[in-house]
């Protein structure tokens, strides 16, 4: 009797079971899009190449493998060195796995059969990678659709599938990329369940960090705690990106935590902490930023800046719905920040006039948010016909699209006091005229505040995936050891 167990991925214990049907549905969605594309011939086949193991420079020390995202989206395969082929007409899938030498069993473990991989990944067929040319020849596809296109965040070109004998086939490398990218922009219900999970575990880890932080600790101790919680409780071997654990003036360094600034400052009394960290499960990302006082109590200045950012974050989320243009949300956040900075006396004058000279970008030079999925900066931000706006702040937006249901984005407004940008503004008469320099001096070593939420656009608004303490009262209570659940923000005005 055939097994009725549906294949799924899980790391056991309480970790999420992800059905392999998620990837079968993705392949189906891709084929449906391709069949509607008039440029796609009958009997076409998609060919995707998975990632390969890499070593540290010239050594034999392996870097922990993480699957290439397009390949993972279509097949959910965790092993390296694989290929995948999808028959566009029928949707049937073939996974090609490496033919491993006998020595593999000595050093790396059991050599699994093709039937093992067929059951594990719920594909229609499994063959070896050294047979890909002969298998495709026997099927006689009219054209092989390979993946080649530019990632609009990095500017890098994705790797196109290549194998010995591919030159014998008719190959098209222009059709597939925009179609599969557009599929990745819109998440299925099964994908959303995984993103809810990554957010839940990462949110819990952020709360643990809030409760544990103490003056005198190193920033990297909080990074370590976050990673430990995500891995031990959530099965997250990887984080979605390098953890950014800023304290004090470091909170004005947008991408702190790199090798030259490795989260190594000692946290001091009176510091604001800005911790931007997200766990990754089965290649699905999360991206959450929490800002809070190191000693557990906001000063008046910290509270003023924090609540300004919280107001912009929640106003944006309340405004989000299908049809909204994302650059308008960035401009809305800028307006609120400038209104609040004027309210506390740091700026004076007409907010409309401030916006005309792009003063908002002095305090928030990055974009308001980005797509999220299998990559922390997920693909699809600038498809053909969507142009980047060449203005301060807005040019850093990772998408300028109109919102649609199923899109998952971050909402991450921030106010930072970056000396380099402040000095430039003060040297520009068009911007300097708005500053109260005496009040500004008070904030020169403040650092910054960022609040980052992960949300999915729904038919009527948005669903908030992140669940961490957000109000001043919730944060102070959490840091004092009160483990009450935060009140979820509904997005209702």
UniProtKB/Swiss-Prot annotation:
Protein's UniProt name: Xaa-Pro dipeptidase
Chain positions found as Phosphoserine: 167
Matching InterPro entries: Aminopep_P_N, Creatin/AminoP/Spt16_N, Creatinase/aminopeptidase-like, Pept_M24, Peptidase_M24B_aminopep-P_CS, X-Pro_dipept-like
EC numbers on record: 3.4.13.9
Family (UniProt): Belongs to the peptidase M24B family. Eukaryotic-type prolidase subfamily.
Highest taxon, organism lineage: Eukaryota
Residues carrying N-acetylalanine: 2
Described function: Dipeptidase that catalyzes the hydrolysis of dipeptides with a prolyl (Xaa-Pro) or hydroxyprolyl residue in the C-terminal position. The preferred dipeptide substrate is Gly-Pro, but other Xaa-Pro dipeptides, such as Ala-Pro, Met-Pro, Phe-Pro, Val-Pro and Leu-Pro, can be cleaved. Plays an important role in collagen metabolism because the high level of iminoacids in collagen.
SUPFAM superfamilies: Creatinase/aminopeptidase, Creatinase/prolidase N-terminal domain
Single annotated GO MF: proline dipeptidase activity
Subunit description: Homodimer.
Cofactor(s) the protein requires to work: Mn(2+)
Species the sequence originates in: Mus musculus (Mouse)
PROSITE patterns cross-referenced by the UniProt entry: PROLINE_PEPTIDASE (PS00491)
